[in-house]
From Swiss-Prot:
One of its GO terms (cellular component) is membrane. It is found in: Membrane. It comes from Arabidopsis thaliana (Mouse-ear cress). GO terms for biological process: CDP-diacylglycerol biosynthetic process. The keyword Transferase applies. Belongs to the GPAT/DAPAT family. One of its GO terms (molecular function) is glycerol-3-phosphate 2-O-acyltransferase activity. The chain crosses the membrane at residues 38-58, 235-255. Weakly or not expressed in roots, leaves, seedlings, developing siliques and flower buds. Esterifies acyl-group from acyl-ACP to the sn-1 position of glycerol-3-phosphate, an essential step in glycerolipid biosynthesis. Its EC number is 2.3.1.15. This is Glycerol-3-phosphate acyltransferase 7. The gene is GPAT7.
Amino acid sequence: MESSTTTSYSVVSELEGTLLKNPKPFAYFMLVAFEASGLIRFATLLFLWPIIALLDVLGYRNGSLKLMIFVATAGLHESEIESVARAVLPKFFMDDISMDAWRAFGSCDKRVVVTRMPRVMVERFAKDHLSADEVIGTEIVVNRFGYATGLIQETNVDQSVFNSVANLFVDRRPQLGLGRHIISDSPTFLSLCEEQVHAPVPSNYNGHNQRLHVQPLPVIFHDGRLVKLPTPATALIILLWIPFGIILAMIRIFVGFLLPLWAIPYVSRIFNTRFIVKGKPPAQATTGNPGVLFVCTHRTLMDPVVLSYVLGRSIPAVTYSISRLSEILSPIPTFRLTRIRDVDAEMIKKELSNGDLVVYPEGTTCREPFLLRFSALFAELTDNIVPVAMNYRVGFFHATTARGWKGLDPIFFFMNPRPVYEVTFLNQLEVEATCSSGKSPYDVANYVQRILAATLGFECTNFTRKDKYRVLAGNDGTVSYLSFLDQVKKVVTTFKPFLH
């Protein structure tokens, strides 16, 4: 192979097995089935996995692909598939990226990704995070009402990909092709490329990319309830665990209501829940003295409850917007902010005069090791500021959602076999670090953000609540408040496995 350092190259790369280490797309269809539909579709696709694997072994790759697409998407609205592709799949794709393949792919100016998966599942990730110019994949047939039929337009997927690449490069063949060496009756897109590199791409391929040290654009916001990629083995474990998880969650929540707050960290060990406390929490404010403002990182809806558990007393929390059910279930008082600055400032001052209070300047949760921009409002209202770094670990289910219903966040948290919460109390801010010393509220907020990020090993960002919800849900993150009957219906439909 000729060595070249030119940046004018065009590249066509296969996604499965090349840019992604995993050559099998089955787990990604499982994600679509679970997140866009429910447990019945998820279980059905899992039970068909032996047939899908057998078809692959026998050489019927198109047949196995069409079966996966049909079971995962038939009856789903196109917007639901797009929503999962936008909010859920990028995280799992990014976790499986081959950096050697990325370096070769990222060194070229014109980048084309080819995949056997439906284009709608891949396009958002490839363009946003891999800077791809074009994505060539299968096309799902959608009826006039916007629902997927489960069928695809292509009869022979490999031949269709070959034709699409050929039509895209009419004037000149692509210089570089990255892909697996596959025996096929149809010509593959690699035969169109001047230079062909078979996966896995060597780590020292061509010795170029000397100028390129950039990483793929990281996934900061993502959604979905599943923590682990649902490979066949993992998916089976999750399915078997769910009934036990629901029972365990109900027991844990009931115990939390029954016992005093100070006893929860001790009793929770019996139910395999751990609370790790670091640092020295401040003493409770005495009568007549203003309370302490706990300024916390925001990881889940459970943050203020866990803070009250480890302090052994009820600490009221101010929230931007939570569901009515979450307010009813909360063992601590919550106060909803109006988003009107003067009104919110007056309310926080009033609550601080009554005792301690907890605020979350990020305004929303973030799952990845990043902190969103801190609102400076808290810095204007008091000098008694105690930063608290909060983080959590779960094994099966995420306890946050942007697309789903937030009222179920605590249930999903307690459905995990061994949830762990870490609470680190930092020292109260010195007077020199507060607005009393002449610092602006923005300087104070940025300082608190930096020390909390350093404590957790996170990175600071300028992203906001609105940025998160625009990426994940296409809205500004405001919760719509439903009637009690509607809340009950939503619980039932969430836990009732269904197939569209």
